[in-house]
Amino acid sequence: RTNLSERGFTDTDELYRKITSVYTWDTLKRTDWFVDYQNLFTFTGVMSQRGMFASAAMEMIEAGETERAVEILDKCQSVIPVENFPLDMTMYGFANERDMVSLIEAYYLAGESAKASALCSSMSDDILVSCKFFLRHYEYAEEYFDSCYTVLGVLSSMADEYGDSALADSIRLRFNKLLE
């Protein structure tokens, strides 16, 4: 039985076939369509597309199929455009940030440190922009600022854990500069 944080058993061959051959993701990857709040909520919260890709990649990694996992992770980046589905959606309170952290960790676990680092860096850049905004309006946005702080802490800790101390230090330094 699956829930938001745990996957059930998966047939990795069938999962891989469906993600790479059956589903085309044509509509999801279009950047010329407007994605409204309801679709953001659906595709990054209720039925998280990034979460589905992250779960599939982790399942592949656990099965020892790291090449397939990387292909799934790369596909996620190509079919879920940040123009429509930003890396940082803390202001909505969806599951997106958790799913992004899972994608980054999956890249690290698959041995793709450069891709993990690039995605982690891009996400932290976006979250730092939100942090700055929420800090400016802290009286009204304390909860959102705290959410950003938490995600940045997770990202910097994960970068440290996987040997990317320069990135971890950069995230912490840039956050601390916001507080000065």
What are these regions (language model features)?
Residues 1-180:
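C-terminal luminal/periplasmic domains and tails of membrane-associated envelope-modifying transferases
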